[in-house]
């Protein structure tokens, strides 16, 4: 049998989430519907084997039974509608990220999907910086807390990802203040990595580019960090 308009609406909302979804998250996009009605719709969709319940502890989440069906539902919606949903969710997770940095990949995901490149890069940098630290020039060392996050976005927590991101940011044509700030950070990260790997010429060149941008932006903390790298490099070379 066919699905009702309300059921279709719930499936549309669910399709914009990358992973499992709580009822509170569905309610964000289904503002006009009360919870009991929504629960009944979710039950009917489960009976039709379109979605399933996932229990995490005592928390109930929902997800599509088949990824391919989720993609089909997603693609059938207008770009305007999808973009609006992604914007609403990006703002929601952005507010949550102040207390809980593990939602940052979701902020990145939704900003990326509504084509806000600057915000997507800003939050990706913030997320990766939360995860990585440089200890004794071994770049990067994963914080132990990273393992608590699970594997949903584990792929983002790789050194290769950070360096790829650095390249993408450095190659951006945009010259706004935010982008220059990000380029400054990425040159610094690349510089530290290169120096740690023994590629001193490239490392120092990146640190110098970071210094140039930091001076333009009056970013004193960043300048200090760059100068420290130059000092470490001098010590290492002797």
Where are these regions (language model features)?
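Alpha-helix C-terminal capping/helix-coil junction sites
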Residues: 46-47, 195, 211
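Tandem amphipathic alpha-helical repeat scaffolds
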Residues: 72, 109-114, 128-130, 144-155, ...
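Tetratricopeptide repeat
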Residues: 107, 126-127, 159-169, 203, ...
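Small side chains
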Residues: 166, 187, 191, 203-206, ...
